[in-house]
Regions:
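Long, contiguous all-alpha helical interaction modules
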Residues: 1-125, 129-131, 280-458
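Long, acidic/polar, low-complexity amphipathic helices and coiled-coil-like
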Residues: 126-212
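Domain-exit/linker segments immediately C-terminal to small folded modules
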Residues: 174-336
């Protein structure tokens, strides 16, 4: 059994990006161990593959996965790269350091991404050297903590914006001085071209969307965080599927731009939708190994300011929450497949009311309904009955009005993928020729059934 050890950058987003990509690339792995190099205080991933050259295999798998994101990156309106031609921007990293041309203001990012992957393909040996235990060096120079991943290129501004000034232990990294007081300085992280290309391509692949709030640009990035546990091959496959579902939910729902406008609403909608898709398997996998409950799905949002980025509000969903939603759904009377179907209806109800609260002429009404939909979902998830009953009463009262119900059902049905429309049409409407109309009626029926069921349970 061959093993490889990958050293992770001590930057939250960069570390999560690497964990996400390594887990997704673990198709040949027997085990992944997420731990800490206690000598240097750096997070590491130990990869166990029953073949020679495990790191080569893992990196080729990773490159193949990144290739699959070409169309997604090309569709992104913008990405979190500072391309101004000025000192300190990301421009010099790519055009001078890697020789990869950044796109113009009106050009898409697909061509840049393709060129970046081409560079990465030709420099996989650099990546191996830069992320291996032997290739990472650290020390203190002129009061600055320096961490070198095989080269001298800066990382993207977004990644290093989470660097820090600190007196003392450098945020958990050990001061290499053996005597005297701790150094006062900055943490400076450098890498070779291969590592920079890998981190950049992975960041673009995991960028779910971009938009703006007022005049401020906002970027949404989804990642997975795993700390201090061992993951086996089939568990890695399960985690990859869970993350794929999470990422697709964020990307699909971000057309309504809820990730930054209503973080709580998006979190609840994502929790219930993920459960509807993977809840049955999550119960089995996590029930067998409770340690997996700690694994987190993270949505992070960032905005640029000058030559750096700052982290905005985001959210986290643990796999424990996903698995535990089964008992919560059973507590309000849903069993079998109904648990998963109803969870998806709740997710769409949250998103559709939030969307209408932004665009409908009766914004006040839909803001109240959105608040009640969130409270209902929260109460079910946490099994707190009182807010559940209050929210249910108000939702039931307003949705007796046919125009309100149909408006919500219209927006909710738009969230259903075209390829899955037939499976969402209820038996009562299977015979209708207009499939979208049949879907609309089915969605209205599902919403009413949900509320009637909960009223009876209450």
């Amino acid at each position: 059994m061959a093993e490889a050890r990958i050293v992770l950058p001590p930057l939250k987003l960069a570390s999560e990006i690497m964990k996400t990509m390594v887990t997704a690339s673990c198709v040949n792995c027997e085990k992944l161990r997420f731990g800490l190099d206690t000598t240097r205080g750096l997070e590491v991933i130990e990869v166990e593959i029953p073949q020679r050259n495990p790191l080569d295999i893992l990196l080729h798998n990773m490159l193949n996965i990144l290739e699959g994101y070409r169309e997604h990156v090309d569709r992104l309106g913008d990405v979190p790269i500072l391309r101004q031609r000025m000192t300190g921007s990301d421009y010099d990293i790519f055009e001078e350091g890697l020789g990869v041309k950044l796109p113009g203001r009106r050009e898409k990012w697909g061509g840049f991404y393709t060129s970046l992957l081409g560079y990465l393909r030709e420099h996989l040996d650099e990546v191996k050297a830069g992320i291996s235990t032997d290739g990472v060096t650290l020390g203190v120079e002129k009061g600055n903590f320096k961490l070198i991943f095989g080269g001298d290129l800066r990382l993207l501004r977004l990644l290093v914006s989470e660097g820090f000034y600190e007196l003392g232990k450098f945020g958990g990294l050990k001061d290499v001085k053996s005597t005297g007081r701790p150094s006062l300085g900055i943490v400076e992280i450098r890498a070779n071209g291969g590592v920079v290309a890998l981190l950049t391509a992975s960041l673009l692949a995991l960028t779910a969307g971009s938009g703006s709030i007022g005049e401020t640009d906002v970027y949404v990035i989804s990642t997975m965080d795993i700390v201090g546990i061992e993951v086996r091959r089939l568990e890695a496959k399960f985690l990859t599927d869970v993350f794929r579902q999470f990422n697709s939910i964020i990307r699909d729902k971000s057309q309504y731009w809820m990730p930054v406008e209503d973080v709580d609403g998006m979190r609840l909608a994502a929790l219930f939708e993920i459960y509807s898709r993977v809840g049955e398997e999550a119960e089995k996998v996590i029930g067998g190994r409770r340690v997996l409950e700690s694994i987190r799905l993270n949505l992070s949002t960032f905005s640029p300011t000058g030559l750096r980025f700052y982290r905005r509000e985001g959210f986290t969903i643990s796999l424990g929450e996903v698995a535990n939603l089964s008992s919560a759904m059973e507590a309000v009377g849903f069993t079998g497949w109904d648990k998963y179907k109803v969870a998806s209806t709740i997710a769409r109800l949250i998103i559709s009311t939030l969307y209408l609260s932004k665009i409908a002429s009766e914004q006040g009404l839909y803001k109240r309904l959105a608040s009640d939909a969130k409270m209902l979902a929260y109460s079910i998830a946490t099994e707190e009955r009182r807010p559940y009953l209050d929210a249910l009463y108000r939702l039931s009262r307003y949705l007796r009005e046919e125009d309100v119900l149909w408006r919500i059902a219209q927006e909710s049905s738009e969230l259903i993928d075209e390829e899955h429309v037939e499976s969402y049409i209820e038996d009562d409407y299977k015979g209708e020729k207009d499939r979208r109309k049949a879907l609309l009626k089915s969605e209205a029926q599902r919403i009413l059934r949900l509320l009637y069921h909960l009223v009876k349970q209450g």
